[in-house]
Regions:
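Compositionally biased linear targeting/interaction segments
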Residues: 2-478
Length: 478
């Protein structure tokens, strides 16, 4: 009996030890699985967040791209809108000016935006956007600003011919001439050197021209191809050496590389307000002729001083401020409507004549005597052809999360037919074997085209169709 009891006792102890080992194994397995599941959850959550961010980024980018394309369409419709009001100007024996429809792009294109944009569109146009189909954006929006690049001084004139070099030198010196900017050129740069107006002007032109000759921006000597020896080795002597490009600027940021373009110069003459690109006096795109109807007051002052460097508004700070104030007030009264119908109207105004000349004189501004009114007239215009479109696509995800993608596109409307002139079916009709009727016939039936032309011929014809929405010459996504 005793032996049997001992055996039972030993067997119970063995079972107890075995149960303890099993418990440890189960707890260990649970711990390992917990770690694995936690890591798997973290990895899955990260991948899901990454996929969501990528999805939102793509959607935001396409919202911005849509805004760019809508802007191109809006600008392309301006000649048609201008034609509608042409009879009114003909009655007054005047040519209808270009209408700055791009200044109201956020309201006109609001029907394609979010609910808030649709409300702005309805208030502006008087039409309820909700009556349209497939309009508007859900869970997102786009923010849009269209900037007239022909309203600015084009630094890329330095990459053109000698006449363009002289014009750019005059405009740069005119822009920098007012005495309120003296302190900018009295400070040392990061290398301990001074850069006066002449050296900065020469550096900008020499960066873009194709020769190795130092351009002279002295206005008293600007009568031809002005050079004063060979370009120096300033850039090669910098701690991080590089060479002059001797080619056109590709972007505004490239101006940072030019001698004398420090932060003070940049904040005054290149990009005074990073949140408002319309205030930029300088550009690297454009036709080269400044639109006096859309140029900001600072740019207008520089352009006038280019043609009349000895005018009071160019050498007297009080007169400069009077001019800037007068232009700002006139723009405010017209609410964006063009002030001048032609370059000659602007010249007449600045010389104290015309309808606006006496108004500026009433403010105390003295008349301007241009060195050559005919030459000055060649540097200005009242019509713009090159525009920057700054579009931001905003994708909303959840309550607080927003994904933003910015697109900056520069669109050139030079040599672009208007919507009324273009016949998008001419190339297709030619491919169908009816080129003689392409210009005057109504839009051909697509089925007939398919029957009369091969698929290869049609594919070859599509690239030849006229582009009425301008040509994109610069494109950047951020």
């Amino acid at each position: 009996m005793l032996a049997s009891a001992l055996r039972l006792r030993r067997r119970a102890k063995t079972r107890a030890r075995e149960r303890g080992i099993a418990l440890v194994m189960v707890l260990g397995a649970i711990a390992v699985l917990t770690v694995m599941l936690a890591e798997f959850q973290d990895e899955t959550s990260a991948e899901a967040a990454s996929a969501t961010a990528e999805r939102d980024s793509v959607q935001a980018e396409y919202m911005a791209k849509s805004a760019v394309n809508l802007s191109r369409l809006l600008i392309a419709t301006e000649p048609t809108i201008r034609g509608a009001i042409a009879p009114l100007f003909l009655m007054m024996k005047k040519t209808p000016p270009q209408l700055p429809v791009w200044e109201f792009s956020d309201r006109i294109l609001g029907a394609f935006n979010d609910e808030e944009g649709s409300k702005d569109f309805s208030v502006t146009v008087g039409v309820d956007a909700k009556t349209g189909k497939n309009l508007g954006i859900k869970d997102g929006r786009f923010e849009l600003v269209i900037v007239d690049e022909d309203a600015k001084i084009n630094a890329n004139l330095g990459a053109a011919n000698d006449i363009a070099h002289i014009r750019l030198a005059q405009e740069l010196m005119g822009l920098m001439a007012p005495p309120q900017y003296n302190t900018i050129f009295e400070q040392k740069d990061g290398t301990g050197q001074f850069h006066d107006r002449l050296s900065v002007c020469s550096a900008i032109i020499d960066w873009g021209d194709q020769d190795e000759q130092l351009f002279n921006c002295d206005l008293t000597k600007l009568t031809g191809a002005s050079s004063s020896g060979v370009e120096d080795a300033f850039y090669q002597l910098l701690p991080k050496a590089y060479r002059r490009k001797n080619a056109p600027f590709d972007s505004l940021d490239e101006l940072h590389m030019v001698r004398g373009v420090n932060e003070d110069f940049w904040a005054t003459f290149v990009d005074p307000d990073p949140t408002n690109p319309k205030k930029r006096p300088l550009t690297v795109w454009g036709t080269g002729r400044v639109n006096v109807n859309t140029a900001n007051p600072q740019t207008l002052l520089g352009v006038v001083c280019a043609g009349a460097p000895q005018a009071d508004i160019c050498i007297d700070a009080t007169q400069s401020q009077t001019f800037l104030m007068g232009v700002t007030m006139a723009r405010g009264l017209t609410m964006g409507a063009p002030l001048f119908g032609s370059p000659n109207d602007f010249i007449q105004t600045m010389t104290g004549k015309g309808q606006l000349g006496p108004v500026l004189a009433a403010f105390g501004m003295k008349p301007v005597a241009f060195k050559s009114e005919s030459e000055f007239g060649k540097s200005i215009s009242t019509e713009s052809k090159v525009f920057s479109v700054y579009a931001v696509g905003v994708k909303k995800s959840g309550i607080k999360r927003e994904t933003r993608v910015s697109v900056h596109a520069v669109v050139d409307f030079q040599r672009t037919p208007s919507l009324a002139q273009a016949n998008p079916f001419a190339a297709l009709a030619a491919a169908a074997g009816t080129p003689s009727a392409a210009a005057s016939a109504p839009p051909p039936n697509t089925e007939n085209l398919q029957a009369n032309a091969t698929s290869a011929a049609l594919n070859a014809a599509f690239p030849q169709m006229p582009v009425t929405a301008g040509h994109i010459i610069y494109y950047r996504v951020e």
